[in-house]
Amino acid sequence: MSMPQAILTDIEGTTSSLSFVKDVLFPYARRALPDFVREHREHPDVMPWLDQVANETGTAFSEEALVATLQTWIDTDSKHTALKALQGMIWASGYQNGDFTAHLYPDAVQRLRAWHAANVPLYVYSSGSVPAQQLFFRHSHAGDLSGLFSGWFDTEIGGKRESTSYQRIAEHIGIAPAGIVFLSDVIEELNAAAQIGLNTVLIDRRDDYPTPRHLKDADHHLHLDSFAQLPF
């Protein structure tokens, strides 16, 4: 596989550990939700998302009901766009207050910097909201890496397991699918990207998956333990 025209990467389990998201970010948002909803429910950036949750679930627009719904979604790792937007707002305070800094694998940091130096455009596609993605890379253990990226995509462009989402991303960045490499630890996402012609790499880190995964369709993708093994 030669140097691609652009690289699209997932975050959780790919550039960064699963445990940071599940053991630090998710519990932080869950704890903060009651106060956040009470203090910001009338804020113009918050109210539309709470309205969406209430309308979609038939939940009465009460603080208690909304918080209970959102906390259940956190517990089940829902990818709902409204939840991700609200989580991002909560995490912003955590980053700014120094409550935590984002984890990035050293091999990912090294390769991201090298690709940027080689003028390869880098993009993020994550279920987390675009503001949350930007905060993640701005407040990392390796410093502010947000400037390495040319663009950011979340589920507002479509679900990560839907091939049409990757078609929209390719059209947005103006590069044919065959010129893009997508990096992820989720086989269903890679399958969707491959359907429209993206080159795909399954990242199967031992820190996140102690036993190598033998997944259906894994042979359809380059299967590596880390960014250090990437051939470009």
From Swiss-Prot:
One GO MF term: 2-hydroxy-3-keto-5-methylthiopentenyl-1-phosphate phosphatase activity
GO biological process: L-methionine salvage from methylthioadenosine
Note accompanying the cofactor annotation: Binds 1 Mg(2+) ion per subunit.
Keyword Cell cycle listed: no
Enzyme's top EC category: hydrolase
Positions of transmembrane segments: none
Pathway: Amino-acid biosynthesis; L-methionine biosynthesis via salvage pathway; L-methionine from S-methyl-5-thio-alpha-D-ribose 1-phosphate: step 3/6; Amino-acid biosynthesis; L-methionine biosynthesis via salvage pathway; L-methionine from S-methyl-5-thio-alpha-D-ribose 1-phosphate: step 4/6
EC nos: 3.1.3.77
Catalytic reaction(s) noted: 5-methylsulfanyl-2,3-dioxopentyl phosphate + H2O = 1,2-dihydroxy-5-(methylsulfanyl)pent-1-en-3-one + phosphate
Keyword Calcium: no
Cofactor: Mg(2+)
Assigned keywords, A-Z: Amino-acid biosynthesis, Hydrolase, Magnesium, Metal-binding, Methionine biosynthesis
Pfam families with a match to the protein in the record: Hydrolase (PF00702)
InterPro entries the record matches: Enolase-ppase_E1, HAD-like_sf, HAD-SF_hydro_IA, HAD_sf
Subunit structure: Monomer.
Family: Belongs to the HAD-like hydrolase superfamily. MasA/MtnC family.
Function: Bifunctional enzyme that catalyzes the enolization of 2,3-diketo-5-methylthiopentyl-1-phosphate (DK-MTP-1-P) into the intermediate 2-hydroxy-3-keto-5-methylthiopentenyl-1-phosphate (HK-MTPenyl-1-P), which is then dephosphorylated to form the acireductone 1,2-dihydroxy-3-keto-5-methylthiopentene (DHK-MTPene).
Entry protein name: Enolase-phosphatase E1
Species of the source: Xylella fastidiosa (strain 9a5c)
Gene assigned in the entry: mtnC
